[in-house]
């Protein structure tokens, strides 16, 4: 399994949203993994440009974090954990 991490400073966050699902976009994997279970690593999107995805495919919601340089989509297998992460970033 691929192992990736990302460090985001609160001061770099321009926007954070809680999404019901991953946007319907053409995400092209640059480096990382894409299986039926997860999307993880570096991707390029026609709408968002350079992206990092840390997404479990059948788990919702999804957090979208926009910084000046990139967009990060992430979630956890447990929706309560994802909501908790969103609240800690959003507040």
What are these regions (language model features)?
Residues 2-7, 15-66:
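Non-transmembrane, membrane-adjacent beta-strand/coil modules in membrane-associated proteins
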Residues 22, 56-91:
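Terminal and domain-flanking low-complexity segments
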